[in-house]
């Protein structure tokens, strides 16, 4: 009865451990949503944001970019005439690019985004993959390219990627231009001052600071993606090794019923040790992920609540995917604790069984030629003459 109870406890321990690891693995899946509109348009975003026109700066900014996007829309419609000759209503404002419309709401995830556009005459909801993940600027550029692709009857994915490549080329060239030569940066500042008709002269340091912050923001979003991928891969490997260790442990327990030793017990202990180290690695990756997300939200909060409220251009909120990642981090921590406790008990088990052996007569040993009786706590008696 006692051996069955111990066996049941061992099976229950493995069942709980594998169930916890499987739940952690399933909680990683929402991070890969918000990528496709067809078939299963599920989205559990990390963050949701909207552009706002409640401040003078935001109103001026949105009106400017809207005029530019309207011009691009007209060009895109004219370029698609060979596929479908444009109709007069195609030039209506409701059919043009609305990337910068304040009514739109963007749901951003690590590898894609979804867009809710209630004022559109076409699709009010669609999702697209975005390799740049949480980089909001890259996401807006890709969305602009996708809408231009629809207007010009071109492959939206190709045009979206092409526009992003153009943006990256311009940004990298400007970054190198500003940081390599202060004289050229001063000339750019003077040119911008002439456009502002005697406004304040932008300094070279301002150009350097803005471009450097954008560069750091891009690297931060890439680092968040890498930590998520590493954490997901490690937990999958940990589940596989924990399953192997569970099978080895069960086979070793069955062999011990018929013999004193089992060659599968050291193998099970080896796989348990690797699983424990992987659980530590999973927690470490998730910790860096949470730190990266905290820095990311601090950067967005600096935009949402700037020092000068008049320059507020967007509002954002952490969304369902982020809170699920926090829950996943807590579960990963307890998974590592459970692995540590299980390995500690496995290490104590062999030594305890040896210590429980009690020779009835210390003077009568197997070498003395007399009968020696060894009683084990496992309930079996061995007699050697």
From Swiss-Prot:
Q: Which UniProt keywords apply?
A: Membrane, Sporulation, Transmembrane, Transmembrane helix
Annotated organism of origin:
Eremothecium gossypii (strain ATCC 10895 / CBS 109.51 / FGSC 9923 / NRRL Y-1056)
- What is the role of this chain? Involved in spore and ascus formation. Required for the efficient assembly of the precursors of the prospore membrane to a continuous prospore membrane.
Q: Does the keyword Transmembrane apply?
A: yes
Give membrane topology per the record: Multi-pass membrane protein
Q: Which residues cross the membrane?
A: 14-34, 232-252, 281-301, 323-343
Biological process annotations from GO: sporulation resulting in formation of a cellular spore
**Family according to the record:** Belongs to the SMA2 family.
| Lumenal face of the membrane | 35-231, 302-322
Q: Which residues lie on this side of the membrane: Cytoplasmic?
A: 1-13, 253-280, 344-385
Subcellular localization? Prospore membrane
Protein name per UniProt: Spore membrane assembly protein 2
- Keyword flag Transmembrane: yes
Give any Gene Ontology cellular component: prospore membrane
């Amino acid at each position: 009865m006692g051996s069955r109870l111990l066996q049941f406890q061992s099976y229950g321990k493995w069942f709980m451990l594998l169930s916890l690891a499987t739940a952690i693995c399933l909680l990683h899946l929402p991070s890969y949503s918000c990528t496709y509109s067809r078939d299963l348009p599920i989205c559990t975003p990390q963050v949701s944001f909207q552009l706002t026109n409640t401040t003078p700066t935001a109103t001026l900014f949105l009106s400017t970019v809207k005029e530019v996007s309207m011009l691009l829309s007209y060009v895109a419609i004219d370029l698609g005439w060979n596929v479908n000759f444009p109709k007069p209503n195609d030039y209506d404002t409701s059919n043009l690019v609305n990337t910068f419309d304040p009514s739109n709401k963007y749901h951003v995830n690590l590898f894609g985004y979804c867009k809710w556009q209630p004022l559109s005459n076409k699709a009010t909801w669609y999702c697209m993959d975005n390799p740049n993940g949480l980089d909001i600027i890259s996401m807006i550029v890709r969305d602009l390219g996708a809408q231009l692709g629809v207007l010009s009857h071109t492959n939206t994915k190709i045009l979206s990627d092409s526009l992003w490549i153009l943006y990256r080329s311009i940004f990298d060239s400007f970054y190198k231009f500003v940081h390599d030569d202060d004289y050229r940066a001063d000339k750019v500042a003077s040119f911008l001052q002439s456009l502002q008709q005697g406004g304040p002269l932008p300094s070279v340091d301002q150009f350097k600071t803005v471009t450097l912050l954008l560069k750091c923001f891009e690297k931060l979003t890439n680092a968040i993606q890498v930590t998520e991928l590493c954490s997901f891969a490690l937990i999958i490997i940990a589940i596989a090794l924990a399953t192997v260790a569970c099978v080895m442990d069960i086979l070793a327990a069955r062999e011990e019923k018929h013999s004193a030793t089992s060659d599968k017990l050291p193998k099970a202990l080896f796989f348990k040790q690797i699983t424990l180290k992987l659980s530590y690695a999973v927690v470490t990756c998730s910790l860096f992920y949470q730190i990266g997300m905290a820095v990311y939200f601090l950067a967005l909060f600096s935009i949402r609540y700037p020092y000068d409220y008049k320059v507020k251009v967007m509002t954002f909120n952490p969304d369902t995917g982020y809170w699920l990642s926090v829950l996943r981090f807590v579960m990963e921590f307890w998974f590592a604790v459970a692995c540590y406790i299980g390995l500690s008990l496995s290490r104590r088990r062999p030594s305890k069984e040896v210590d429980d052996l009690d020779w009835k007569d210390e003077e009568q040993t197997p070498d003395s030629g007399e009968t020696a009786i060894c009683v084990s706590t496992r309930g079996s008696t061995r007699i050697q003459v």
